[in-house]
Amino acid sequence: VQVLLGNGFYNEQGGRYHKLKVSFGPPTLLLALHITYHDGSKETIVSDAAWQWSLSPITFNSLYGGEDYDARISSTTWHPVVVQQAPKGILRPQLAYPVKVMEHYEVAQTLRRDSILVFDMGQNLAGFPEITVKGKRGQHIKITPAETLTDDLRCNQKQTGRPHYYTYTLSGKGTETWHPVFS
């Protein structure tokens, strides 16, 4: 079992736009996975001191500030987890519907300003970008969403909070497709 943890509201990262000014600590996991097999047998997998952690290609994630992904990182170095003391109080589930992609939008218009491309979606929408690119190892792509543009075609984030952006660092291994996972 592998689990990818993001910061969420629990550990709001600074350095970019964020609404919360507090952090409750690093991402933490308490897992009890109940499995019922086709033959009726059951198994429970729980997170404990035997689990391990490793870095991921996601080097920054914030609900409001964006996400950075370095496709060159493929860590195979595993470390023992740090077992934390259980919080006080009664553990209650937090029920939430999954985030689903409801619709894909194509770019309505592409504008160029020097080495910067501006992709106009043709409407205001809530969503996240997905890119498919091919390039050299270590090349960086920065995606800055905005509701409006300045007169010189720069992103204007005054209405939405700033700075908010995504970066993707290419692995250089052929065609690469990426979209943020945690923002």
Which residue stretches match the model-derived regions?
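Extracellular/oxidizing-compartment recognition motifs
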Residues: 2-183
